[in-house]
Regions:
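Residues forming the flavin
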Residues: 1-27, 67-191
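Dinucleotide-binding Rossmann-like beta1-alpha1 core, especially the glycine-rich loop
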Residues: 7-61
């Protein structure tokens, strides 16, 4: 049985604390495929979609105290470190789940979302997607969004290989919790 926390609508992100990192400075390799200006516009668009579906008015951190952030960057550089600030919209776990539900509920009637229906194969003819086979059923489509997430990564790698597609690994950003007395980090965390 698949792990509940990484499958389904929204995947693992559905149960996250709902923080949107609104920067081009880290978080993957999308800037390998487009320039930073275009990427920044897409990040802004995604933020606007989250706002339209329930995130409007949720706090964005990182715009205030620019002088203090500049000073932290200077101190980090003096220690041969990089302090990379980012704007973060904090939606919260409950609001994040509601937003994902509103998004799904907004799909037009001709869009079908199937859960608990693992895809066996992607159907391709003459270099164009035609559909998928899932659970012995054939589903035809003009466009396909294949987004298997971490849980389906192994299947997707094999499927891409069988279709002759080039794949590349992407780093996963992992947060690390370091517990120290509050006084040590207050100059950073209180900004």
């Amino acid at each position: 049985r698949r792990a509940y926390m990484v499958c389904g609508w929204g995947g693992a992100g559905a149960f996250s604390v709902g923080k949107l990192t609104l920067t081009t400075d880290y978080g993957g390799y999308l800037d390998d495929y487009m320039n930073k200006g275009e990427l920044a516009r897409l990040i802004s668009y995604v933020d606007s979609v989250y706002c339209r579906f329930g995130g409007e008015g949720r706090q964005v951190y990182g715009d205030e105290h620019r002088d203090k952030i500049h000073e932290l960057k200077r101190k980090a550089a003096a220690a041969d470190l990089a302090f990379i600030p980012a704007r973060i919209r904090h939606l919260g776990t409950d609001v994040n789940g509601e937003i994902l539900t509103h998004m799904r509920d907004s799909f037009p009637s001709h869009v079908t979302v199937k859960a608990n229906c693992p895809v066996d194969h992607i159907l391709v003819k003459d270099g164009k997607v035609e559909g998928v086979i899932a659970g012995g059923e054939t589903y035809l489509c003009k466009y396909l969004v294949a987004a298997p997430g971490r849980d389906g990564a192994e299947w997707f790698t094999k499927e891409a290989e069988s279709l002759g597609l080039h794949t590349a690994s992407n780093a996963v950003d992992i947060g690390v919790l370091v517990e120290s007395p509050a006084e040590i980090y207050e100059p950073i965390t209180d900004i």
